[in-house]
Amino acid sequence: IEATVAMALENGVNYFDTAYPYHGHQSEPFLGQAMKKYPRESFYLASKLPMWYLKKEADVARYFEEQLERCQVEYFDFYLCHAMNEERFQMLQEYHIFEKLAEYKKQGKIRHIGFSFHDSPEVLEKICSAYPWEFAQIQLNYVDWDFQDAKAQYEILERHGLPAVIMEPVRGGALADLGEGPNQVLKRADQKASIASWAIRYAASLPNVLTVLSGMSTDEQLADNIQTMTEFQPLSADEREALENALEIY
């Protein structure tokens, strides 16, 4: 992981997303170890409060302080209430979680307070309206734009003035290979571009997007994403048409 982090930082990647349960609870310690040799101001670190582990109000402080230690940092640039839905919204209110995170922000331990989301647009509207959030993380890609309410969720965030952090832009890797027919449509439009890069660019082309997350398991995937974003251009009208044509036969 240290070599991967070094390659990312050296090539302009500066937003690193982790969470308490990722990789068998080892993601935060691994990332903390890998990042500690770099100046703290050279990267943005995002982690998340594990909502489903909270059994009482005091657990908020317990997990938050533990996460700072695990990541070997004094503050999180972005801190999210993890996987918010209707049930966890009730917990958020009952345990006064936003108020506690706002206190940590006053203390300089959090720079920006947000949440990641997995529920309906109606629930998203309710959560956005309840507190002065600064950003939100949603699943968005060119399949889920209509199929899974991503368009409606994106527009809710836009209306509330909340920048969107995009997760699953390549839909768990599914949009890295669309099958022979759709792949050929995209290759005719741009012979050099990887199929996955179309998905990354689709998400990054939206104006209210703060950053696009991408889970990468190989240096080749990292290199492809670096190239895509280093040379980034929003999708043109012709490219959008090619993507629509590919989707028709997907």
Identify the meaning behind each predicted range.
Residues M7-L9, V13-N14, Q33-M35, A130-P132, ...:
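Structured C-terminal cap/extension of enzyme domains
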Residues Y22, K37-A61, H82:
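Structural motif corresponding to the early beta-alpha repeats
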Residues E10, W52-V170, E180-Q184, D190-Q191, ...:
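Glycine/proline-rich, positively charged
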Residues Y22, Q26, H118-D119, S217:
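Short beta->alpha linker loops
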Residues D17-T18, S47, I166:
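Hydrophobic residues in well-ordered beta-strands that form the structural core
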Residues Y15-Y22, R111-F115, Q137-I138, T211-L213:
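Short catalytic-loop micro-motif centered on adjacent basic/acidic residues
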